[in-house]
Amino acid sequence: TCNDDSFLDDAAKAGDSRWVHRPRIDWERAERRRIRGTPEQRIFEGLKHLIAVRKTTSAFADFNNRELIDVENPHLFALLRTHPALQGDSVLVVANFDVNAQFLDLEGLSKRGYFRLGQVQDLATGLSSALSNGQLEIPPGRFYWLTEHRALAGF
């Protein structure tokens, strides 16, 4: 449920608009997360996966290590997370807020030392993408947690 304005009927909550995003939980619907193939199950499993990835990615540790990145595209929001002690461990979080695919130009980041190998990996999906002329296509409404893909030597 989005934007539940029933909080306005409670005098103790009416002055605090944060309650608009805190609707009552429909526990029957929540239980559907256990039924394979339901939207509730797919969302629940997806969130569990993202939490697991965050827990194993040191750049996501809370060191107040967020840097907003101007990618010169008004439809894309980007921020860089870098572990302060492990400078090579960085994640570029990029989200496309447009209804059309957008292109992320990583050439500027390459000049700053990021994504020089020409291939990036999305930590959220595990998929790697080769860059074409320093451009990466971001589908509409999608986000990526990008890190530089490093092939293991000898494998």
Give the positions of each predicted feature.
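Generic detector of short alpha-helix boundary/capping microenvironments
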Residues: 38, 129-130
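Generic hydrophobic-segment detector
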Residues: 86, 116, 130-132
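Short, surface-exposed, polar/charged, turn-prone segments marking secondary-structure boundaries
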Residues: 29-31, 120-123, 148-150
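Loop/helix patches that line or flank the sugar-binding groove of alpha-linked glycan CAZymes
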Residues: 1-114, 138
